[in-house]
């Protein structure tokens, strides 16, 4: 039994939760065939994802230092040579791995590498990849992991319908779990029907309503296998440019988001997606000052308009798109104060120290840290990480 469960066994009632978590979260298949697209648009029912695990998370947090809590806020770009020391010294919430990390590896070797890290971490680590399929594949591009790389969900759906989509998505989830990966940063919930859009080849290339139904199915497939998924890139990419290399300013109306972009996110949330990843686009109709991932107003949309109670993840704060939008201080500090729970970063130690200093200087309320950490740990318990 994993380390966090060993901690929980000693706590009254918590052990009971450990035995029933799968039935509660994944045992009941959602009948997506009954999805009414008007309901997708109008449904505003709040679903509390991890509330039953908050007491367990709070008990664990009582024994955590401030340093450990701050570390839990970060999903760190993986570096094999530094990962062990980071776990020992800075207590990260987890790592995000990229294609280079799977080169010259096998299923067994990467599993052993991840297991070794898990064994020295007090709190189980999130191990994430972007294995969307098609244009973005980190794992299946290598023949040691799969004979051929996964195609995009769109390609599978276009050629084999829902049956093939379900088969390949569940195969993907099973493969990732077998290697020690517990979070797939997918599916792409963006709406695009224009082949010239930067994001188009990663989408279903369908209108908002059809995309919403398919996204709901994708979330359900992942949940049935038991891997965490993540809707991206909230609040919707549209026809914007690549934010890995520059900022994208979205001039669309608020009504456009309500009537289109929000629909797939709403359906994913209705199907109990545990995490949502926020983009670096500037959404002028919501917040013309900050990229979405650093915007308290955008995060409020996700929490209050879409009633999302799960983990909010930033896109990588080391991307060019956020540079220049933080005049004084740190992008990580702004992200925490904006309501993000988990910060993806390629500059971990620097951002960790900035957040620690901000708490010391009372620029971040410790209650804000505690709220995010409690949600992150409750998520880890719920998904048996």
Pin down the residues of each PLM region:
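N-terminal hydrophobic targeting/anchoring segments and the immediately downstream early-domain regions
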Residues: 3-127, 131-141
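Extracellular glycoside hydrolase catalytic/binding regions
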Residues: 249-259
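Short, well-ordered coil/turn segments that N-cap beta-strands
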Residues: 71-72, 93, 122-127, 181-182, ...
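Alpha-helix-loop-beta-strand connector modules within alpha/beta enzyme cores
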Residues: 117-127, 206-227, 292-313
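Mid-to-C-terminal alpha-helical segments outside catalytic/metal-binding sites
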Residues: 360-385
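Generic structural signal for hydrophobic
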Residues: 86-87, 117, 176, 222, ...
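Enzymes and membrane/adaptor proteins characterized by extended Gly/Ser/Thr/Asp/Glu-rich
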Residues: 89-211, 233, 238-251, 279-294, ...
């Amino acid at each position: 039994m994993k380390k966090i469960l060993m901690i929980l066994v000693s706590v009254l009632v918590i052990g009971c939760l450990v035995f029933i978590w799968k039935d509660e979260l994944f045992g009941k298949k959602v009948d997506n065939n009954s999805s009414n697209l008007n309901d997708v648009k109008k449904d505003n029912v709040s679903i509390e994802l991890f509330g039953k695990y908050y007491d367990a998370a709070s008990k664990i947090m009582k024994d955590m230092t401030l340093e450990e809590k701050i570390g839990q806020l970060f999903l760190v770009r993986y570096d094999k040579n530094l990962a062990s020391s980071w776990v020992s010294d800075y207590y990260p919430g987890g790592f995000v791995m990229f294609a280079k990390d799977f080169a010259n590896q096998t299923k067994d070797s990467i599993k052993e590498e991840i297991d070794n890290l898990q064994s020295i971490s007090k709190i189980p680590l999130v191990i994430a990849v972007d294995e969307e399929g098609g244009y973005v594949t980190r794992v299946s591009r290598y023949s040691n992991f799969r004979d051929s790389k996964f195609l995009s969900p769109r390609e599978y759906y276009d050629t084999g319908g829902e049956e093939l989509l379900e088969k390949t998505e569940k195969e993907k989830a099973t493969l990732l779990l077998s290697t020690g990966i517990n979070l797939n940063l997918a599916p792409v919930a963006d709406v695009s029907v224009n082949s010239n859009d930067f994001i188009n080849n990663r989408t279903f290339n369908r209108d908002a309503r059809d995309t919403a139904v398919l996204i709901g199915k994708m979330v359900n497939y992942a949940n049935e296998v038991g891997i965490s998924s993540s809707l991206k890139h909230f609040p919707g990419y549209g026809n914007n440019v690549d934010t890995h290399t520059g900022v994208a300013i979205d001039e669309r109306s608020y009504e456009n988001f309500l009537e289109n972009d929000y629909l797939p996110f709403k359906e994913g949330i209705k199907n109990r997606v545990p995490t949502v990843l926020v983009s670096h686009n500037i959404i002028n109709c919501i917040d013309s000052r900050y990229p979405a991932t650093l915007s308290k107003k955008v995060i409020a949309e996700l929490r209050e308009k879409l009633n999302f109670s799960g983990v909010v993840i930033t896109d990588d704060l080391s991307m060019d798109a956020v540079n220049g939008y933080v005049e004084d201080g740190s992008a990580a500090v702004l992200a925490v104060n904006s309501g993000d729970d988990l910060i993806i970063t390629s500059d971990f130690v620097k951002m960790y120290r900035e957040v620690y200093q901000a708490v010391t200087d009372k620029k971040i309320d410790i209650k804000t840290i505690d709220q995010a950490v409690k949600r992150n740990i409750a998520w880890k318990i719920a998904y048996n990480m």
